[in-house]
Amino acid sequence: VIGGDECNINEHRFLVALYTSRFRTLFCGGTLINQEWVLTAAHCDRKNFRIKLGIHSKKVPNEDEQTRVPKEKFFCLSSKNYTLWDKDIMLIRLDSPVKNSTHIAPFSLPSSPPSVGSVCRIMGWGRISPTEETYPDVPHCVNINLLEYEMCRVPYPEFGLPATSRTLCAGILEGGKDTCRGDSGGPLICNGQFQGIASWGDDPCAQPHKPAAYTKVFDHLDWIKSIIAGNTDASCPP
């Protein structure tokens, strides 16, 4: 996260970290949505990875830290054919449930869609410099704004984004605050509701008039709830 500060240790109990199998690299974030399920971005998938819950500092473990591996992974249309503007969402079933503890608690799914102009919080262990490979030991948090989708469509003509999509656009038009590499899959929390999953943005991050895109959680609620309920054939909205 660019332009932020260390998150309060109590404000991110639902934030999980995806690590490579030997814990060498924290490569993505995710959100615990109940005791057995994590929501993240499809582009965070890799063959072997582990999920750490209840962590704050990568160097100083919390007593209630937990580690899990994926038991099952679900994608839209159960394929990985996500594009830059569509279906960048992955639902992970943990190999065993986690109990709530001091630093672990799920975040409920949104009850209403977000509105443009909302203040949204982003968080993660991703890069804190737009140009250098500088990663923090603790998650950083910052507030940005939910913008019109057009604001993400216009600055990136090379992506050929469609006129509408199941993507949210968020950032600060003057730049300086943004998610960055390593923050993918983490939550966008608008007015206290979990509304987005960090999907993609410009490189370097946090440039003026180059906001980032977040998968819209609200549009995928039926799919998420169906999968969790055991209907594994559920398909995402078209």
Swiss-Prot record:
Chain location of the short sequence motif Cell attachment site per the record: 181-183
GO annotation terms (biological process): proteolysis
Domain of life per record: Eukaryota
Single GO cellular component term: secretory granule
Glycosylation sites: N81, N100
Enzyme Commission number(s) of this protein: 3.4.21.-
Ways its activity is controlled: Its activity is completely inhibited by PMSF, and almost not inhibited by EDTA.
Tissue: Expressed by the venom gland.
A GO MF term: toxin activity
UniProt keyword annotations, A-Z: Disulfide bond, Fibrinogenolytic toxin, Fibrinolytic toxin, Glycoprotein, Hemostasis impairing toxin, Hydrolase, Protease, Secreted, Serine protease, Toxin
Localization (cell): Secreted
Peptidase S1 domain mapped to chain residues: 1-229
Record-given protein name: Alpha-fibrinogenase shedaoenase
Organism phylogeny: Eukaryota, Metazoa, Chordata, Craniata, Vertebrata
